[in-house]
């Protein structure tokens, strides 16, 4: 990553677009996780954690982002 940033021959607009997309993904992911942790204590208290399989949840999350 550091070598790519310092390279002079790269197209400036393409690099900026790539950086913006990456930062937006990271911030959205952090916000989504915080919101879910709060909701789990309230609405999903009766929902058994074992039945709500982590594999299915992670697959849906990967497709969305």
Curated annotation (Swiss-Prot):
Q: Which PROSITE patterns match?
A: PROTAMINE_P1
**Region Disordered: which residues?**
1-65
Q: State its location(s).
A: Nucleus; Chromosome
Taken from the UniProt entry, a GO cellular component term is: nucleosome
Tissue expression, per UniProt?
A: Testis.
In the record, biological process GO terms are: chromosome condensation; sperm DNA condensation
Task: Output the InterPro entries linked to this UniProt entry.
Answer: Protamine_P1
Q: Which UniProt keyword terms apply here?
A: Chromosome, Developmental protein, Differentiation, DNA condensation, DNA-binding, Nucleosome core, Nucleus, Spermatogenesis
Annotated Gene Ontology MF terms? DNA binding
Function statement? Protamines substitute for histones in the chromatin of sperm during the haploid phase of spermatogenesis. They compact sperm DNA into a highly condensed, stable and inactive complex.
Protein family per UniProt: Belongs to the protamine P1 family.
Full protein name: Sperm protamine P1
Q: Which organism's genome codes for this protein? A: Lagorchestes hirsutus (Rufous hare-wallaby)
Lineage of the organism: Eukaryota, Metazoa, Chordata, Craniata, Vertebrata
